[in-house]
Amino acid sequence: MALPIVAVVGRPNVGKSTFVNRLAGERDAIVHDEPGVTRDRTYRPAFWQDREFLVVDTGGLVFDDDSDFLPLIRQQAELALQEATAAIFVVDGQAGPTALDYEIAAWLRQLSLPVLVAVNKCESRQMGQVQAAEFWSLGLGEPYPISSIHGSGTGELLDQLITYLPAGETLPEAPEIQVAIAGRPNVGKSSLLNALIGSDRAIVSPISGTTRDAIDTVIEHGGTQYRFIDTAGIRKRTHVAYGPEMFSVHRAFKAIHRSDVVLLVLDALEEITEQDQRLAGHIADQGRACVLIVNKWDAVLDKDTYTINAYRDRLYQRLHFLEWADALFVSAHTGQRLEKIFAAVDAAVEQHRRRVTTAVVNDVIQEALHWHTPPATRQGRQGKIYYATQVATQPPTFAIFVNDAKLFKENYRRYIESQIRQQLGFRGTPIRLLWRSKKPREAAELVAR
């Protein structure tokens, strides 16, 4: 059965993200002293008394501000409450009840949902009881004094919470594919995610950088589970101020690191930038499978049968780190070619996890040597390849045993890699070659195994 969901709501800077981190046992959500810093709703698994549930961290609620984001944040909170089994309303015990707290409480009372009031920042147990008592006036039942920083009081709160959650064991999750959606700000990452999953799950706004956190969404398609990680837009370092956005860039790189495959989203209306190149290099360095997604293709004017080919040529020229990745020309707005993304992801992951027998690898190496022997040095020393074998997957990694690795310069190493790709494919994934020096006797022992 699906895990029950608990929505965490409240006004800005009452400690919602710190509270969620406490429940989840990790420092994952961005915590920073800025109203509305958690713009999207983020899901974290939590456990209490052998019970598992998901905690949804929503943005700080404000009802009377002119900010462009605040209506979107309220909408995200509403969506979280619609799918929740219970809610936790976090308030600030040091500040006492505010007018905004009363507004939020009135809004929550209209919902047919159990609501617990967590009075945060109650660092003293004795004073906490006094501070919490003020919040009876919200009309939501007993307030629970807690300290998200120290963890005090959360046990009593959670004991009450699990009485509202359905009993039952959760089934083990099916194997899933982790997909990071990455790219510069405003290339359409969240719009792409929304189109793929069919709901306004992530905030979408024309203002650059509206998705600050790395958000997970799990869906099932064609019998396979996909965990989509929608990352914040990645800017040049000189354009990233200290604060939440800097943390989000770090989070985006973490999302790439924990993914199986990265959808690198590009804007068809803009040229490939230096930041696109740096991001492509990072994906390759991390050894992640990748699919290039050229978004907004519907907005490209005067297209003909040669337009895609011309763009693809420029794309691979600029992003030579990812010349092994397939490119899809799509529109999140119209849905053009979106159905091909799942197949491309599946194919890339299959190649990323692929293993080839040692006999096949050595057949490819011998064929490559037949057409192009390693060049000799000025002193007449000739490079020799004794043996090759695949030693790892994700990404596919091959050990090449040679007489002296220093004799094989970059050009010849690229030639061997290109021959492996030409003969064996591995489209959609980087491959790595480990050049290992071995004495002839050691090499003979390896071959004999």
Curated annotation (Swiss-Prot):
Quaternary structure (record): Associates with the 50S ribosomal subunit.
Keyword line: GTP-binding, Nucleotide-binding, Repeat, Ribosome biogenesis
Gene Ontology molecular function: GTP binding; ribosome binding
Organism expressing this protein natively: Thermosynechococcus vestitus (strain NIES-2133 / IAM M-273 / BP-1)
GO process annotations (BP): ribosome biogenesis
Record-stated family: Belongs to the TRAFAC class TrmE-Era-EngA-EngB-Septin-like GTPase superfamily. EngA (Der) GTPase family.
SUPFAM superfamilies with a match to the protein in the record: P-loop containing nucleoside triphosphate hydrolases (SSF52540)
Reported function: GTPase that plays an essential role in the late steps of ribosome biogenesis.
Binding positions for GTP 2 per the UniProt entry: 183-190, 230-234, 295-298
Domain KH-like: 354-439
Protein name, per record: GTPase Der
Binding-site residues, GTP 1: 10-17, 57-61, 120-123
Keyword GTP-binding annotated: yes
Pfam families: KH_dom-like, MMR_HSR1
Entry-linked InterPro entries: G_ENGA (IPR031166), GTP-bd (IPR006073), GTPase_Der (IPR016484), KH_dom-like (IPR032859), KH_dom-like_a/b (IPR015946), P-loop_NTPase (IPR027417), Small_GTP-bd (IPR005225)
Domain EngA-type G, chain residue ranges per copy: 4-169, 177-353
